[in-house]
Amino acid sequence: MSPKTETKAYVGFKAGVKDYKLTYYTPEYETKDTDILAAFRVTPQPGVPPEEAGAAVAAESSTGTWTSVWTDGLTSLDRYKGRCYDIEPVAGEENQYICYVAYPLDLFEEGSVTNMFTSIVGNVFGFKALRALRLEDLRIPPAYSKTFQGPPHGIQVERDKLNKYGRPLLGCTIKPKLGLSAKNYGRAVYECLRGGLDFTKDDENVNSQPFMRWRDRFLFCAEALFKAQTETGEIKGHYLNATAGTCEEMIKRAVFARELGVPIVMHDYLTGGFTANTSLAHYCRDNGLLLHIHRAMHAVIDRQKNHGMHFRVLAKALRMSGGDHVHSGTVVGKLEGERDITLGFVDLLRDDFIEKDRSRGIYFTQDWVSMPGVLPVASGGIHVWHMPALTEIFGDDSVLQFGGGTLGHPWGNAPGAVANRVALEACVQARNEGRDLAREGNEIIREAAKWSPELAAACEVWKEIKFEFAAMDTL
């Protein structure tokens, strides 16, 4: 005789294809505190009702498939299925909807961003019933976020390690990004750190190429930062990029960095992958290394308004996977970022509790409980004239990173670093005195330039530089 469960499944099974909305569209569902909630921007194919499209997203990203299967009877679909519980039209857009989906926590492996994304942003994005699909936001419940280590150290521990408080940190990406020998690269690192920067950075493209192997770069950069530390009395760092072709090689590079005694390493978390990133974050926590994260490849995923995934989701994923810094756009400069939206995900990186605020693109209230915060890094086409705006927009808990804005100084790398440090100190002092950086910013920089020839030269070089393109990332 067949087992009872098999008999029941066989008797109750009806083969064929049925509408997703019959099972996965549940507007009466009340979300649980333990559910992972998702807001999808859905563009259905012509003739597909929004309820069917939303239900299809819920089904294909959880327990559903294209036809009824008899093994459905061997489990409890009501316990494990995703549910589309609300749909709202997008204002000003034709045939576009925000579909809200709730996922039971048991669908996801603990501590695995990889597994979470494999379900939520997996095959469903190629589903034929949809013209386009974009994941706008996720609500990560404390019951799930507590299964992650998160950032190796966080903002307060980093400040304590560096002994630097009350101002943004200053950085610089070494340019040209490719082609320098290790010794010349180390020279540029020394000059920038000696001039007053807190950090210098490997470009995301720099791994271990024929013109500069990773071990040589690590050695010369370590020598440069220790020399600059001795001469300035300040703790310095260089983001040594440990990204590699295998996880084993990545960890080997991080181990070598720790043996050199440097304070920080770097990883390209999207091209390297979440599994590799989480492994590196755990190593950094265990061995006292800070972890700088670059977001190379993010625009492939997040730039299109109606398809892909918004960067705020990638930012939340990074906070769970682990990183002490992550690039976040600038609002000003050459790389894209609309102010309210950028500040929305900056808060999601730094703060413990973030209220729902649709004006800033935040679809759900997010409670990170005790997970450490991540410093946002403003980088890309910025220079001394941007310093007041950057200081006002990002506040103290940030890294302001000037690549060309340091190395492009007419007098050289060290004067470029001096110009940026003087501009930052002037802006912080003016802010602390109660001056309005947004309104008086240019005047504050001009006043400081009277006492700093390096800053005056920088102001003259970059006074006409503007990047006047409209941001695409708007609500």
Curated annotation (Swiss-Prot):
Modification N6-carboxylysine, positions: 201
Signal peptide start-end? none
Propeptide positions: 1-2
Site-annotated residues for Transition state stabilizer: 334
Molecular functions per Gene Ontology: magnesium ion binding; monooxygenase activity; ribulose-bisphosphate carboxylase activity
Q: Which residues carry this modification: N-acetylproline?
A: 3
> Which EC numbers does the record give?
4.1.1.39
| Residues at the active site | 175 (proton acceptor), 294 (proton acceptor)
Assembly and partners are described as: Heterohexadecamer of 8 large chains and 8 small chains; disulfide-linked. The disulfide link is formed within the large subunit homodimers.
Per its record, how is this protein called by name?
Ribulose bisphosphate carboxylase large chain
Please report the organism this UniProt entry assigns to the protein: Piper cenocladum (Ant piper)
Q: What is the lineage of its organism?
A: Eukaryota, Viridiplantae, Streptophyta, Embryophyta, Tracheophyta
